[in-house]
Amino acid sequence: MTQSVPPGDIQTQPGTKIVFNAPYDDKHTYHIKVINSSARRIGYGIKTTNMKRLGVDPPCGVLDPKEAVLLAVSCDAFAFGQEDTNNDRITVEWTNTPDGAAKQFRREWFQGDGMVRRKNLPIEYNP
């Protein structure tokens, strides 16, 4: 599967980072919006740097042009100040879906030779 058109832009709200506020003795959930601002259908997948502390629901999906999805980013309880949080982030990866593909996410879209774009959203923890 070759793709000559690189994936277009997405927007995220918030645009640059995610902030969680103390206390961290309970689970926090923060919502972010991902908007496909391109003219083509995309498949997206979300990765986190810390699987045991951070979760995203839904972790992947398909967005038509101009369509948006609300994602729940959750942070499980942890001992703030006793764990390294410096590199925590979530990464949105997206790629154009093949022409004629059903609107159902497929992991192999990211494993071929098609172009995949990424947007990192660092996570900030306020004490």
Swiss-Prot record:
Domain MSP: 9-126
Keywords tagged on the record: Acetylation, Cell projection, Cytoplasm, Cytoskeleton
InterPro entries with a match to the protein in the record: Ig-like_fold, MSP_dom, Nematode_MSP, PapD-like_sf
N-acetylthreonine found at: 2
Localization terms from the record: Cell projection, Pseudopodium; Cytoplasm, Cytoskeleton
Annotated SUPFAM superfamilies: PapD-like
Chief subcellular location: other
Tissue: Sperm.
Acetylation as UniProt keyword: yes
GO annotations of cellular component type: cytoplasm; cytoskeleton; pseudopodium
Gene3D superfamilies referenced in this protein's UniProt entry, alphabetically: Immunoglobulins (2.60.40.10)
Domain of life: Eukaryota
Coiled-coil region: none
Reported function: Central component in molecular interactions underlying sperm crawling. Forms an extensive filament system that extends from sperm villipoda, along the leading edge of the pseudopod.
Other comment: Around 30 MSP isoforms may exist in C.elegans.
Name of the featured protein: Major sperm protein 152
